[in-house]
Regions:
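Multi-pass alpha-helical transporter architecture, strongest
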Residues: 82-93, 288-310
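A late C-terminal transmembrane helix in Major Facilitator Superfamily
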Residues: 243-274
């Protein structure tokens, strides 16, 4: 366990969050937050993967020349420094109408703090349909709408303000069971109409998607993946002596990928719903990447010249 800790908290955790962000969360963001249709989003991501995939070989080869650590650290640093501007640019390129509405028609949710849940639901069993705040913020987050929050008076209903229009979110727990779904659906319809009136599109307009720019941004995200992932197999082999190599590699690889990477989309959405900003989900990979960058610079050894037969 002592020998696997550096690999888990440095190499695998960093590789995992950069990998999941560049390949999986980018697709999730395009479809769920920017509202690009699934076929177009998957096609654009596939094109970016075709461009970026050869860099796995390139950075693996380069790591034989200059070492594993410099390339992995550089990929980690670039990811932490550029994720926010890149995903902002992705919104501008994929759904310019949404980006414009976010700037010109801010949305404010007014609610009591204790009625707003942290919507972390890794297994998809929780239902955030009792309090008005949860009903409003869950819908706005799924719609890719940025919103600010402000406290409301004790006992007051949750309100959503878009420009000069104010909507009251239903507190479903106060309603008879038979009326809850109807009240929530009616509120969703009113909220969708208000968003439409203020320029928030229900979906990205395919004719306005800057496809070359979207592919370029996605390809750059994939290249970050290749920088941290290309050298990682060799580094893991070189980190451990032969007698414990596969046990030592397996533990950090599966825990790092399963826990740190697997929870990324769910955690990112929970952060978005809690903060009201569609980009704040990026704090999860940025913080993890920054932490593991510092950890790696201090504690992770360079392994490229080690004898793997030892």
């Amino acid at each position: 366990l002592k020998q696997t800790n550096p690999a888990l908290f440095e190499a695998i955790t960093r590789e995992t969050v950069v990998w999941y962000t560049g390949q999986f969360y980018a697709l999730f963001f395009l479809e769920r937050m920017v509202k690009v249709d699934g076929f177009t989003a998957n096609t654009l991501v596939a094109m970016a993967l075709l461009i970026g995939t050869p860099f796995f070989i390139f950075f693996g080869w380069l790591s034989d020349k200059v070492g594993r650590k410099p390339i992995i650290m550089a990929g980690c640093a670039l990811a932490a420094l550029t994720y926010f501007p890149l995903f902002n640019a992705l919104t501008e390129a994929a759904n310019p109408a949404l980006a414009h509405a976010q700037r010109t028609a801010p949305v404010i949710v007014s609610a009591q703090g204790d009625t707003c849940s942290v919507q972390f639901d890794p297994i998809g069993r929780n239902r955030y349909d009792q309090e008005g705040c949860d009903i409003a913020t869950a819908y706005l987050a799924r719609a890719g709408v940025n919103y600010a929050t402000e406290p409301a008076a004790i006992g007051a209903d949750a309100l959503v303000r878009i420009g000069d229009q104010t909507l009251t979110a239903p507190t479903a727990r106060r309603l008879p069971e038979a009326e809850r779904a109807r009240a929530i659906a009616a509120f969703h319809g009113e909220l969708r109409a208000a968003l439409d009136a203020h320029g928030y599109p229900p979906a990205a307009d395919p004719a306005r998607i800057n496809k070359p720019l979207v592919v370029a941004i996605l390809a750059l995200l994939v290249i970050y993946v290749t920088m941290v992932y290309g050298p990682i197999a060799a580094m893991l082999v070189e980190l451990f002596p032969t007698r414990i190599r596969y046990t030592s590699m397996s533990l950090p690889y599966h825990i790092g990928n399963g826990w740190f990477g697997g929870f990324l989309p769910t955690t990112a959405f929970a952060i978005v719903a809690a903060t009201g900003n569609i980009y704040n989900g990026l704090w999860y990979p940025v913080v993890v990447a920054a932490f593991t960058l510092v950890f790696g610079l201090l504690f992770l050894p360079e392994t490229s010249k080690r004898n793997i037969d030892a």
